Amino acid sequence: TAWTFLKAMQKCSKKREARGSREAPETNFPDTTEESAQQICCTRDSSDSKSVPRSERNKKGIQCQGEGSSRGSQPGQFVGVTYNLEKRPTTIVLINDTPLNVLLDTGADTSVLTTAHYNRLKYRGRKYQGTGIIGVGGNVETFSTPVTIKKKGRHIKTRMLVADIPVTILGRDILQDLGAKLVLAQLSKEIKFRKIELKEGTMGPKIPQWPLTKEKLEGAKEIVQRLLSEGKISEASDNNPYNSPIFVIKKRSGKWRLLQDLRELNKTVQVGTEISRGLPHPGGLIKCKHMTVLDIGDAYFTIPLDPEFRPYTAFTIPSINHQEPDKRYVWNCLPQGFVLSPYIYQKTLQEILQPFRERYPEVQLYQYMDDLFVGSNGSKKQHKELIIELRAILLEKGFETPDDKLQEVPPYSWLGYQLCPENWKVQKMQLDMVKNPTLNDVQKLMGNITWMSSGVPGLTVKHIAATTKGCLELNQKVIWTEEAQKELEENNEKIKNAQGLQYYNPEEEMLCEVEITKNYEATYVIKQSQGILWAGKKIMKANKGWSTVKNLMLLLQHVATESITRVGKCPTFKVPFTKEQVMWEMQKGWYYSWLPEIVYTHQVVHDDWRMKLVEEPTSGITIYTDGGKQNGEGIAAYVTSNGRTKQKRLGPVTHQVAERMAIQMALEDTRDKQVNIVTDSYYCWKNITEGLGLEGPQSPWWPIIQNIREKEIVYFAWVPGHKGICGNQLADEAAKIKEEIMLAYQGTQIKEKRDEDAGFDLCVPYDIMIPVSDTKIIPTDVKIQVPPNSFGWVTGKSSMAKQGLLINGGIIDEGYTGEIQVICTNIGKSNIKLIEGQKFAQLIILQHHSNSRQPWDENKISQRGDKGFGSTGVFWVENIQEAQDEHENWHTSPKILARNYKIPLTVAKQITQECPHCTKQGSGPAGCVMRSPNHWQADCTHLDNKIILTFVESNSGYIHATLLSKENALCTSLAILEWARLFSPKSLHTDNGTNFVAEPVVNLLKFLKIAHTTGIPYHPESQGIVERANRTLKEKIQSHRDNTQTLEAALQLALITCNKGRESMGGQTPWEVFITNQAQVIHEKLLLQQAQSSKKFCFYKIPGEHDWKGPTRVLWKGDGAVVVNDEGKGIIAVPLTRTKLLIKPN
């Protein structure tokens, strides 16, 4: 009973006082399964309340009916005055400065003073007419008198009835003024509540309660009555406008459970940093002789909620057919589903347990939510005393640890694991799959396997995961394959034969062994001499630019981080690859932050061919490959440096397949052990040099890998769009292009021309001024190797001849391999200035025999048109000054300058780089953001102590900005109204700033029918676009500050520069892209209006499939999807993003 416990605690307290120590009491706890006495507690309402706290009572020497006060292991820590209801709850109060022993009666509405006590008062007031009291003995006559009551520093003046009754009664009228409460639950007033605040500018939830069925309503009322009687909830005040709906579910036991939807409230609460970053793992426990697992009952209901925050937790109990007004309540303790409940609970429990941890640093005490693990190496008696003391500390604060959930005998169930003193296991689980599984069933199965993989080495999920490919809805049926069933059976066999894993020994080093399964899953185990501590697995990424070694190197970092988190040390790694492979990866290793200590064993299967790839050209043969399509048929071709060519028709294949087959064909045909492969396919080059590594014999890349294995060294090079080797060209053209590739690949001052133009352009290496009648020799870094039976001819360009520049380059013989120099003479009337990068001469490769003639006919057409001689270039030098003026005024981007003034992009970039305001400052981190027409992002930025609200359209980059006087809801709303008046936004994305999430702004956006979402900077679906726009806008504002008097003027000029003076998509300005999009929207609306009366048709693509289907009739079209009748799957819904609507086809 509670009396036995209190007496035992008093006895232990006296023993500790006699010893002068702070040891735990040695008494046992009362059996909570037996009928325990109810208790009445006088507790404090707030920090300044002085009504009947136990600590105050002990200082005064006041006890209840001779009952001794009970202390726990911490002096000065008390729950309050506790009265066993087997005896009368009495206390001593001062009435008119007279100490009187009174009865606490929470069932009495009015306090009554006995006649005997009235006569003992030091001073008495006037008598007033009283009211009759109807009791067991009949009607009792009374009169009332004014009294002054003092208790623990609190004074109240009131009237009490005086009657001839056996004992003075303090009823609810005076008990309430004294701050006393009847508490039947564990809600502890000894625990100080934590302050909870709403985000600035937000309000509490006001969501109406939805109807509940009669059965659920009866269950809810029953639960509410119990919570109300236990003090866990209270009736809401009449002026409380907040509400969050409740719902009721039935548990497996048949009992009802009340839940509250607090999602809207959670959005408005100021949330701090998460303090529980993961579950503790048994592999990190240190082996100990004795263990105990405790469970804290009704954990949330023990901790009081901030009284100022309680109104926001209000909920409503409705009635059937509005039979009576709704009843409304608020939570007094932490509610389930509240975002801060876990944080407050764990933080509170952490502070309570901290003194225990400091006293016993050698004891392992793990706290995760309401589960506690205690491990020690002392005697069994000492361990038991530790548990008794720990339970006493918790009970003093109101936390009960029920005996029925106290685990003192192995095996112990803890966080899904089974613990024994010698080893640990994952709790036994049989993996089963239903006959016709859905996506949800498979995902649950994969979650169970992933959970068990840390305790059962070797579990795999690759084939099981493959069954979910193409499935989007949770209830969608999946095709359960034989491979998946076999993998499931193998996993069950491993679980059945799983052995217990070991605990961590801090005196020994750890070893991590990594292996690769036949399914290309990386598995690992962490070991010490006593055995395996834990295990894990990771599905390796294939065909994503991730080689096997790269996968494993990143896995090492993951395991090292995991190990440091669990035991504070990094293990030594035993890996299935060589040091050479690691060094090869380290050359590309920007993704490696550090490497742990590694023990190398052997090479990874299927990855040794990578060691044959080199970074520099070899001395062997060079082969140029290309693939293409002609009339729907793929063609692969290659040409070697010794003049050999080959073409092969491939049938109906993709362009990428043709490129890959050309490389495969070149490797197969050459006998050389050292080979240089040059391709213009970035796809093939990237895959071969970085992307492969997990391929087997079934892979289309396998022949290339096998051929690389047979070589000594292979060099792969990529050149962008080299000429010639295309599907419809002959072998002799391929040979010619080989030489052009060689010319184009040498030096930086040689540029390709149009396909129909001969030769290459030579560029000026640096700025040169050529006076009138002066001759200069201009060097270049261009080197060529003239092919056999050919010569090179350096000559002038017509655009240079217009200015009077005469080129005397001359002939380059077949054997010449030096740098090209160009002799230039100014025969004009003014000085000529040549700018770096300017095309001033050309190089043409000719055969020795070129006397063939061909008649002219009408088929001779040209990309040049009929402009003739001198029309290749424009005399753009004259436009440089105008372009410089343009950039000085508007800070226009290089591409816009080049387009508007017909100057080379190199010159435009030089103009921009000479501007001190337009120097590039780098860019922020990239994010994954939504981009679509009429989808905007907004953010506030600060410059010169002023606030700028920036809107940017995500598709075009068009910027609209305005100055705000204050960063509040009112100013933001006015700016949004102006923005909505000028444009037609459909959606807006902002951060979680107080002005954006304020209720007026949210309601305004709803009224304007603008979808509003929020996020975190540089996070997926965030406002990364507007962040970059803010940086650009600030740069442009600073560029214009020298020419303006106010920030407002500079802002407007900067907006003109950003929207009309820089390029966006396709070389157009953001303004042009935005206007084009709006015109297209209007055009599409007109087309839809015209097609409104006709039946709609569409092409569509089913998720998980690659081919388009249709055209087919649209049965129904909604805002986000269409319904069509598919031949294979029947009537289905297809997202609009996977459809192309059209009018009925002919």
From Swiss-Prot:
DNA-binding region extent: 1096-1144
Polar residues composition bias: residue spans: 29-41, 66-76
All copies of domain Integrase catalytic, residue ranges: 921-1078
Post-translational modification: Specific enzymatic cleavages in vivo yield mature proteins.
Positions of the RNase H type-1 domain: 617-740
Active-site residues from the entry: D105
Keyword DNA-binding among record annotations: yes
Zinc fingers, Integrase-type class: 878-919
Regions of compositional bias (Basic and acidic residues) in chain numbering: 45-59
Keyword Protease: yes
Domain Reverse transcriptase, chain residue ranges per copy: 230-419
Entries under PROSITE patterns matching the protein: ASP_PROT_RETROV (PS50175), ASP_PROTEASE (PS00141), INTEGRASE (PS50994), INTEGRASE_DBD (PS51027), RNASE_H_1 (PS50879), RT_POL (PS50878), ZF_INTEGRASE (PS50876)
Region (Disordered) location: 13-77
Residues noted as binding Zn(2+) in the record, renumbered to the chain: H887, H891, C915, C918
EC number: 3.4.23.-, 2.7.7.49, 3.1.26.13, 3.1.13.2
Keyword vocabulary terms for this entry: Aspartyl protease, Cleavage on pair of basic residues, DNA integration, DNA recombination, DNA-binding, Endonuclease, Hydrolase, Metal-binding, Multifunctional enzyme, Nuclease, Nucleotidyltransferase, Protease, RNA-directed DNA polymerase, Transferase, Viral genome integration, Virus entry into host cell, Zinc, Zinc-finger
PANTHER family documented for this protein: ENDOGENOUS RETROVIRUS GROUP K MEMBER POL PROTEIN, RNA-DIRECTED DNA POLYMERASE-RELATED
Family, similarity comment: Belongs to the retroviral Pol polyprotein family.
Function: During replicative cycle of retroviruses, the reverse-transcribed viral DNA is integrated into the host chromosome by the viral integrase enzyme. RNase H activity is associated with the reverse transcriptase.
Protein name: Pol polyprotein
Species in which this protein is naturally found: Equine infectious anemia virus (isolate CL22)
Gene (name only): pol
